[in-house]
A protein has these predicted regions:
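Short, acidic/polar
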Residues: 22-33, 54, 78-89, 171-172
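Active-site gating/metal-coordination segments in enzymes
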Residues: 51-135, 142, 188-192
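Mid-to-C-terminal alpha-helical segments outside catalytic/metal-binding sites
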Residues: 1-4, 23-41, 210-211, 216-222, ...
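Conserved, mostly hydrophobic/aromatic
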Residues: 7, 34, 57, 88, ...
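Active-site environment of divalent metal-dependent phosphoester hydrolases
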Residues: 11-14, 49-52, 77-80, 102-105, ...
Length: 269
């Protein structure tokens, strides 16, 4: 079974978010960790705290094109950067875009019209977009309906940033499940182990994982870790899905653990 981590971060400089490790994480360490945990591939999500993180990710792809792909970013509030999207997928390993809106300046963008130009252009160019959308899940449904050929994936099952404990983490779950009716919306089940307060195998998470699987199915639910903020091992993040969930097995397990996300972002298997 091919195992593909749907979200990792690499960075060489800058001040990481408080819930991530505070030292750089480079491709050499990531590859060693992946090999130790049995991870075949990983999709790099360049970080905004390192302004050169897109190029760092491209360097990783050039060195290891069979191991890494990228969901990159650019400054959405700088009009001069908008032209970059037209040739975005011409960059090595660049499979899509990923954005999050954590600072006060950007939190209103999904609703105030700032991003209205982005959705039709990404749809036209067939560029998948991944969003940290916990604060605007209903808005994602509106975008998906208006742009039915735009592929949208929701980071971390819609869990708000820096949340701890399953009850708090899954308070948006009804809003997330409501998006399953849109065939162009998928869910990244990334970083889930980091929300558990109970020990491995994190039984507090299992019901929500099952409900998301039942709603979205194996082709629109993607396993991953966001490994640099996990309090458990990469291997435990794997076996949470491959061993601890009795309802996830066979071809469905293979899809969730990597094949489905590769298909979603058109990363050749």
């Amino acid at each position: 079974m091919m195992i593909v981590d749907a979200q990792i971060h690499l960075w060489a400089k800058g001040k990481p978010s408080a819930h991530h490790r505070q030292t750089p994480y480079l491709k050499e360490e990531a590859l060693a960790d992946m090999d130790a945990a049995g991870i075949d591939r990983a999709v790099i999500h360049p970080v905004m705290w390192d302004p050169d993180s897109n190029e760092l990710a491209i360097e990783a792809v050039r060195a290891h094109p069979d191991r890494f792909a990228i969901m990159g970013w650019f400054y959405l509030d700088q009009a001069e950067q908008r032209a970059a999207i037209e040739t975005w997928k011409n960059r090595p390993g660049m499979k899509g875009l990923r954005f999050y809106f954590s600072d006060p300046r950007s939190q209103s963008w999904p609703d105030d019209g700032t991003l209205d130009w982005l959705w039709p252009v990404a749809e036209r160019l067939d560029i998948p977009v991944s969003l940290q959308a916990s604060a605007f899940l209903p808005r994602v449904g509106q975008i998906a309906e208006r742009h039915p050929r735009l592929k949208i994936s929701i980071d971390h099952m819609g869990v708000p940033r820096a949340t701890q404990g399953a009850e708090a983490a899954y308070r948006n779950l009804p809003q997330l499940l409501a998006l399953a009716k849109h065939p162009n919306v998928a869910v990244k089940a990334t970083g889930q182990a980091g929300y558990a307060l109970d020990p491995y195998p994190f039984h507090s998470l299992h019901d929500a994982l099952h409900r998301v699987f039942d709603a979205f199915g194996p082709r629109r639910m993607f396993w991953g870790t966001d490994i640099t903020r996990m309090h458990c091992t990469w291997h435990q993040c794997v076996t949470l899905f491959t061993e601890a969930l009795p309802w996830l097995k066979g071809p469905d397990l293979e899809m969730v653990m990597g094949r489905a996300f590769c298909d979603w972002i058109d990363w050749e298997v």
